[in-house]
Regions:
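Active-site and channel-lining beta-strand-loop segments
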Residues: 380-402, 563, 789-808
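FAD-binding core of FAD-dependent oxidoreductases
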Residues: 170, 325-345, 368-372, 407-417, ...
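C-terminal catalytic domains of large/alpha subunits in multi-subunit enzymes
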Residues: 5, 65-66, 73-76, 99-112, ...
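Thiamine diphosphate
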Residues: 307, 332-355, 359-363, 369, ...
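Phosphate/diphosphate-binding loops
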Residues: 141, 355-410, 543, 646-678
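Flexible, low-hydrophobicity surface segments
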Residues: 1-202, 206
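Short acidic, glycine/serine/threonine-rich loops at helix termini
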Residues: 81-86, 149-152, 276, 306-308, ...
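Helix-loop-helix junctions that connect adjacent transmembrane helices in secondary transporters/permeases
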Residues: 181-313, 489-568, 771-773, 788, ...
Length: 935
């Protein structure tokens, strides 16, 4: 088996790979391990009064377990964790208070991480942020004792008679009922008081005469914020936006447009990764007898997790704050569910109260209860369309405007709701060219578990709504649904709903062109007629299509990468990337092959401390003259389909430095020069008329000359992307070259394991034309286009939908690894299938009652997939072209999210084609199908 697939061999052989596999002995940590259980509130709409200590002791005795040590909110204060307690009043607005139990004013050391929420532990006398928020940390000596108590605690009887937690029933508030009305589609959506809103996003773009307006230059405009307390300059802009929105609405009737009004609901779902959140922590001392908080856990966001724990260690009352070391493990699935999770914070909190190591390991019940979820969403859309020429029925149709109001359930703790709402709003109009748009999105605070950056980041919710509506409009005007789409697609140089130009390559039109020629599409009517002619119409057949342009990355993306070559030619890659089943380890290993002639034999992921070393360290600060170590961002969380476009680019840039300034000079010594057409074949550098040079020989020569001649045997690079790749000139070995990186350190021989051997290379500058001046206002700039053709059968008696055929059409660019790509396609389809037909986390309080597990949460199985599998159609980039308008010649796109975004609307459109029923509430359960089939 090739070395870069070794991780998969370890998994199938049952070796220790994931965080759950390891114990403290594996890490060499001394002392008895305590097992952590988080005791959680069962209500968030009334004051929590405290634990019933007598009842708790009675339960421990009943179960025959040794009573654990119990840490509560007051214990945090006693250990100087004096973070502010902020409570929700009856309106739901958070407000900062000093809790009476503290008896002290807040001081400068009070810190609550932005992504953590309002409480660490709910204090007596306070309202919890959400059902399931911890009120106490229990430290058990035996893991079996913990499991006994956890099993007892989730039984319904715990709520009856003598519950463990005491609440003040007279303090019940009703603010959350409005939220339940929002997320319950059967009761309908409605507007809410601003006090219940985490944040809002607006995209108003009007071309109405005398009321022109665009979000370009007015990123934070709010057409509803017109009060006297608003800054006058902002109020003036907001007033313009408000007038523009009203002008758009008036123009619909004035121009005689046809209006389609629809409300769509997409449910909350669980990421359902197989490897549950697990970790170990130990507050101990290092070799220099300094305190260190060691954490070993799986995470998608190692830097953010470490920074979060550092907010705790900064409160350490006894001398110098402990240093934080974070060791990461492959996580066996993330899907956004481990992105800015609070797990590491609670793990560290427990370690502060124990003189030995601690272990926190969620079971499936706990993961369902408190893990990050996909946002439930309501989209109220008003789509206006009409003939280009009202006098000519054959003139074709124009999309006049989209007026959309979006509500997303953010749960009780603010995770990444604001950017998710923003991206959902940005994609509300899909890949289509509307003349005007008035889009508003709101993140809502509820009693439920926190919602975050689950796969798709708000775009699947938007795609379900707009693709269903476009399909319905095409049907209403008697047009082929794909042909109708093709006429109205955004292309490169168009503007998005925020008014910004789409500068880079966009291939949605080619996706639709390919789909229109597919046999599954061209034969759909004949197949539907065939089904209609048999079985008295009991089973109906239909084919649906949906497409999307899926944003890649975040609004700004930064990564570190290191490539080093040993004296024997072995290649090592280190990266801030995280392996979570998407194949990053393999992808980065083979990324070195084009430049170094072989794949890396060793890949180290989740690297943090090494890239923060003094010899390499960059400063997180805006670019500025005379500040060659400044960079606006250090690195990303592992999300947003970043491997292909961002991490591989960084590895390639590091490998290029090693080749240009390490191996190439050695080849020139042998050949006299290195021609442009030199290339690698079977591990040897070859060129016409020149003897092949083995990689091992070049590596040995580079190491031998490294110290004396300054040849590079290793390189660490940092890249930064914000609408364009930052670039600068670097001088090495007397040669100056422009590179699409903003940080560089090189190794001149020696042991690459010792990061102290690296030397920082000062960049010349970061040209402002390399990072567009308006980039900070440009929400997204690179997109992967995708589409699905899906055939279904609908049993009109049972309401059961079966997917019988499927084609994924994908704009992935150059394929880096075919099997990994195919795995993403199949996995994305399965996830989309689950969201469409099966999965559902009910709104609070039912969805957070602590008893949700796979017996109550159906997921798709292999038998639910199309019998012949998911067919894949790839859209290659023509030779000589690239994704970016300017900059590095990147030809690969991240597609992990694009492959699932359009599954939901494609199935819904297939059901409509089969039955005529347009369904706007997910999941499409048999009961909802039968309801939709009623006359």
């Amino acid at each position: 088996m090739p070395p870069f697939l070794g991780d998969r061999e370890d998994k199938v052989r049952g070796k220790k790979v994931y965080g759950r596999d390891f114990n403290t002995r594996d890490l060499g940590w001394e002392g008895a391990c305590r097992h952590v259980y988080l005791l959680r509130v069962t209500f968030a709409d009334r004051k929590y009064l405290g634990l019933d200590d007598a009842r708790l002791l009675e339960v421990f005795t009943l179960l025959g377990v040794q009573p654990p040590e119990i840490i509560q909110a007051t214990d945090l204060h006693a250990r100087a964790f004096t973070a502010p307690y902020r409570q929700k009043d009856s309106s739901g607005r958070p407000r900062t208070v000093v809790h009476p139990a503290q008896g002290l004013a807040l001081d400068d050391k009070s810190v609550v991480p932005d992504f953590f929420g309002l409480y660490w532990l709910t204090p007596p006398g306070g309202y919890a942020d959400n059902i399931g928020q911890p009120v106490a940390i229990l430290l058990f000596r035996e893991s079996n004792d913990l499991r006994k108590f956890a099993t007892w605690n989730r039984e319904p009887s715990r709520h009856e008679g003598s519950p463990l937690l005491r609440f003040d029933a007279s303090s019940r508030v009703e603010w959350q009922q409005d939220i339940q009305r929002l997320v319950n589609p059967l009761l309908g959506a409605r507007a809410f008081n601003e006090e219940a809103i985490y944040g809002a996003t607006h995209f108003i773009r009007s071309q109405v005469k005398d009321n022109e307006f665009s979000a370009q230059g007015h990123k934070d405009h709010d057409p509803d914020a017109l009060g006297p307390d608003v800054d006058p300059a902002k109020r003036a802009i907001n007033l313009q936006a408000n007038k523009a929105r009203e002008a758009i609405r008036r123009s619909v009737s004035e121009e005689g447009m046809t209006v389609l009004r629809r409300t769509f609901f997409s449910q909350s779902i669980d990421p359902m990764f197989m490897e549950l959140e697990t970790g170990l922590a130990f507050l101990t001392r290092d070799d220099e007898c300094k305190r260190v908080m060691r954490i070993a856990a799986g995470t998608q966001s190692p830097r953010k997790d470490r920074e979060g724990v550092e907010t705790l260690t900064a409160l350490w009352p006894e001398g110098e704050a402990p240093r934080v070391e974070l060791k990461t493990y492959p996580i066996g699935g993330g899907f956004g569910g481990r992105d800015l999770s609070t797990f590491s914070m609670y793990l560290a909190l427990a370690a502060f109260f124990c003189d030995g190591p601690v272990r926190l390991a969620f079971d499936r019940y706990e993961q369902f209860l408190c893990g990050i979820k996909r946002h439930a969403a309501v989209l109220q859309n008003v789509l206006a369309y009409g003939l280009k020429d009202p006098q000519d029925p054959k003139s074709g149709y124009v999309l006049h405007s989209l007026d959309s109001t979006i509500y997303m359930d953010g749960g009780g703790v603010l995770n990444l709701t604001k950017p998710v709402v923003q991206l959902c709003a940005l994609h509300a109009a899909g890949p289509y060219r509307f003349t005007h748009n008035a889009i508003s999105g709101y993140g809502i605070s509820t009693d439920g578990a926190p919602s975050g950056s689950m796969r798709g980041f708000g775009i699947p919710q938007a795609a379900f709504a707009i693709e269903s509506m476009i399909d319905e409009v095409a049907s209403a005007v008697g047009a082929d649904p794909i042909a109708f789409r093709r006429e109205k697609l955004l292309t490169t140089n168009d503007v998005d709903v925020s008014g910004f130009e789409l500068r880079h390559r966009l291939d949605t039109e080619r996706i639709c062109e390919l789909a229109q020629r597919e046999p599954l599409w061209t034969g759909r009517e004949a197949k539907r007629a065939e089904y209609a002619a048999r079985g008295n119409g009991l089973v109906k057949y239909g084919v649906g299509f949906a497409c999307a342009m899926q944003a890649i990355g975040t609004s700004e993306d930064a990564v570190f990468a290191e490539v080093s070559v040993s004296s024997t030619g072995e290649v090592t890659v280190r990266s801030t990337a995280i392996e979570m089943g998407q194949g990053s380890e393999t992808s980065l290993a083979i990324a070195t092959r084009p430049l170094l002639g072989r794949e890396a034999s060793r890949v180290v992921l989740g690297v943090l401390g090494r890239f923060d070393h003094d010899t390499i360290q960059l400063n997180k600060a805006p670019y500025a003259p005379g500040q060659p170590r400044n960079t606006p961002k250090l690195d990303n969380t592992m999300s947003a389909s970043v491997t292909a476009f961002f991490h591989i680019h960084a590895v390639e840039e590091a490998a290029r430095v090693v080749f240009d300034h390490g191996l190439k000079p050695c080849a020139a010594d042998i050949w006299g020069d290195v021609p442009e057409d030199a290339r690698w074949e079977d591990g040897k550098l070859v060129a016409p008329g020149r003897p092949p040079i083995p990689m091992e020989e070049l590596a040995a020569r580079a190491h031998a000359r490294a110290k004396e001649d300054g040849l590079c045997t290793g390189a660490i690079v940092h890249t930064y992307y914000r609408n364009a790749y930052a670039c600068s000139e670097y001088t090495l070995g007397g040669t100056t070259r422009l590179r699409y990186i903003d940080g560089l350190a090189v190794l001149h021989g020696g042991d690459a394991e010792d990061v102290r051997g690296y030397q920082h290379v000062t960049r010349v500058d970061v040209p402002y034309d390399g990072v567009a001046n308006d980039a900070k206002h440009h929400i997204r700039s690179v997109y992967a286009s995708a589409g699905h053709l899906i055939a279904v059968t609908v049993n009109t008696r049972s309401g059961v939908i079966d997917v019988v055929d499927a084609v994924t059409l994908l704009d992935a660019g150059d394929v880096h690894h075919q099997r990994i790509l195919e795995g993403q396609v199949e996995g994305g389809f399965a996830m989309g299938l689950g969201m469409t037909l099966f999965e559902n986390v009910p709104p609070a309080p039912v969805g957070v009652d602590g008893r949700l597990n796979l017996h109550r949460y159906p997921v798709p199985r292999a038998t639910h997939m199309p019998p012949s599998g998911v067919q894949l159609r790839l859209l290659p980039i023509p030779e000589g072209q690239q994704i970016l308008r300017s900059g590095p010649p990147i030809r690969k796109k991240g597609i992990a999210e694009a492959v699932m975004t359009t599954v939901m609307p494609a199935i819904a459109n297939a059901v409509a084609h089969a039955t005529g029923a347009r369904l706007g509430v997910l999941p499409l359960t048999p009961a909802r199908v039968l309801e939709g089939l009623k006359p």
